[in-house]
Structures are given as C-alpha cells and as structure tokens.
Amino acid sequence: YRRQRQMCIRDSAKTLRMIGQMHKAISVIQFKLEAEIIRRRPDFEMDDRMLLHRIDFERKTITMPNGKEYELKDSFLPTVNPADPYKLTDEEREIMNKLHRSFVSSEKLKKHIRCLFRYGCMYTVSNSNLLFHASIPLNADGTLKDVSIAGKMYKGKALLEKVGHLIRTAFFAEEDNEDRPFAVDYVWYLWCGKDSPAFDKDKMATFERYFLKEKELHKEVKGHYYS
C-alpha cells in the first residue's frame, strides 16, 4: 500500500506538471491570436493587451504599459520568438487547426449554439423586470455611456440590440458576407473588451495573473455600472 501510495503521489506530481505545461502553452497561443485581432481592429483600443513584445528574455523581465519593469515568475517561453513574438510556430498552428476542425465539425455543439443564438437575447423583460447579463456601460454620473462600434455610437437598449445583431451575424451569416469578419472579431471583444456590456472592466488580466506576482497588476477595474 505504501509503495502504491508513493507511486500515486509521483504520478500526481507528474500529471500536475504536465497540465501546467499544457496550460502555459495554450495561453501563449491565446496571447498570439489575440494580438492578431488587436492589430486588425485598432478601434477596439486594446494595444495595451499586447504584452509578449515587451518581454526582455535576457533580463527575465517585462516592461508593462505603465512604463515599469517587473520580474517574470516564469520566463521560459520556448514558443515565443523574440524577433517575432506573435507569430505562431508550425506546431501551434497545427494545434489550432485541429481545435478548429473539432469545433466546426461538432453537430451537437452547432445545435446548442444555434438554439442559443436563435432564441437567446442580450436582454429581456419578464414580469416587468429588465433582465440582462453583466452590465450596461455607464458614465461616472450614471448616464448611459456612448460606445463606439464600427464608427457608430450606441448606448443602452440600442447597444444591447446592436451587440445581439453582431453575435447573430457572426454565426449565421455566409462566409462571403462583408459584415461577418468584424462580427466574428467583436464576439471576442464581447468577452474581454472594456466597453463590452458582457465584460465592462478596464482589462482582462490573464497575463498578469499567470506571470507577475504583483497583486496590483492583477486587479480588473470594473465600469461605473458597478459603482
């Protein structure tokens, strides 16, 4: 029993180490792919979320957008080329191609998503109650905040309806629909963008939480809706 227990402990440590390595590898892929969207959509105003090029691998530090240099908890990122930090390696691209095929070929997943997007909504009114997910972007004085989407301003109900339209365009529109590429990118912004009604924070501090020990950098400042 003692020997079996020791083997289990060793196997658990090995498994945890492998999970950690996989987590780090897929996180780096995430940062690289997010950079592609950020570069493609300057109107998202998310340049501060591109951080890989700020790493000094020799010093094992990173200079953050606030101008300060911080020591990395882990600087071993073998898939990041300092000369071109956001370029996927061949192996990373192969992983993403396989993941993409798995998602688009899953009929059960398509069925669930199709149901959500066909019948779901960014908001609804039930028993005279307004129901919505997360927040409504507000100004400091509590008034509805104007949010820019593709060069036009939206707020309140109009914002939620525009977001709902973009979500459906991303999923239901044909590949050659000229509005689809922006809609697809906006679905990502909806998840982590500062003016997204589904997020409404100044940033998603994924990199900071994984690689920096300073707690103040982990903080995600919520919008005025939460004040």
Predicted ranges, named:
Residues V28-F31, A35-M96, H100-F211:
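Extended, H/D-rich, highly charged conserved domains that either
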Residues R10-R17:
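A conserved mid-domain beta-alpha-beta active-site/ligand-binding segment of alpha/beta enzyme cores
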Residues Y1-I9:
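Single conserved hydrophobic/aromatic residue that forms the stacking wall/gate
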Residues C8, R101-V104, Y226:
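Catalytic cores of large soluble enzymes that bind and process phosphate-bearing ligands
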Residues K215-V221:
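Short glycine/proline- and acidic residue-enriched helix-loop micro-motifs
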Residues V221-S227:
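C-terminal, well-structured subdomains that either form a transmembrane helix-short loop-helix hairpin
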